[in-house]
Amino acid sequence: MEKLLLFATIILCVKADEICIGYLSNNSTDKVDTIIENNVTVTSSVELLETEHTGSFCSINGKQPTSLRDCSFAGWILGNPQC
């Protein structure tokens, strides 16, 4: 009995580190680009990246923000989404 329990525990631990990635079949037309694939159909999506800007930056606690502009060294370090 103990051997059977030990064997079952080992099998469960071996299978526990697997992740299954699948797609839900639906009639959605939303397509997104993921890290590993392009044009993947999803059930719903929300655009989180701003595509427009008013041109003004707000100061926070009296400190002006740093404009990262085009992929400068500071942009890479601070995580400019355009880089």
From Swiss-Prot:
Keywords carried by this UniProt record: Clathrin- and caveolin-independent endocytosis of virus by host, Clathrin-mediated endocytosis of virus by host, Disulfide bond, Fusion of virus membrane with host endosomal membrane, Fusion of virus membrane with host membrane, Glycoprotein, Hemagglutinin, Host cell membrane, Host membrane, Host-virus interaction, Lipoprotein, Membrane, Palmitate, Signal, Transmembrane, Viral attachment to host cell, Viral envelope protein, Viral penetration into host cytoplasm, Virion, Virus endocytosis by host, Virus entry into host cell
Recorded GO CC terms: host cell plasma membrane; membrane; viral envelope; virion membrane
Post-translational changes noted in the entry: In natural infection, inactive HA is matured into HA1 and HA2 outside the cell by one or more trypsin-like, arginine-specific endoprotease secreted by the bronchial epithelial cells. One identified protease that may be involved in this process is secreted in lungs by club cells.
Glycosylation site residues: N26, N27, N39
Membrane topology reported for the UniProt record: Single-pass type I membrane protein
Molecular function terms from GO: host cell surface receptor binding
Signal sequence residues: 1-16
GO annotation, biological process: clathrin-dependent endocytosis of virus by host cell; fusion of virus membrane with host endosome membrane; fusion of virus membrane with host plasma membrane; virion attachment to host cell
Keyword match Metal-binding: no
Family designation: Belongs to the influenza viruses hemagglutinin family.
Subunit structure: Homotrimer of disulfide-linked HA1-HA2.
Its job: Binds to sialic acid-containing receptors on the cell surface, bringing about the attachment of the virus particle to the cell. This attachment induces virion internalization of about two third of the virus particles through clathrin-dependent endocytosis and about one third through a clathrin- and caveolin-independent pathway. Plays a major role in the determination of host range restriction and virulence. Class I viral fusion protein.
Protein name: Hemagglutinin
Name of the gene encoding the protein in the UniProt record: HA
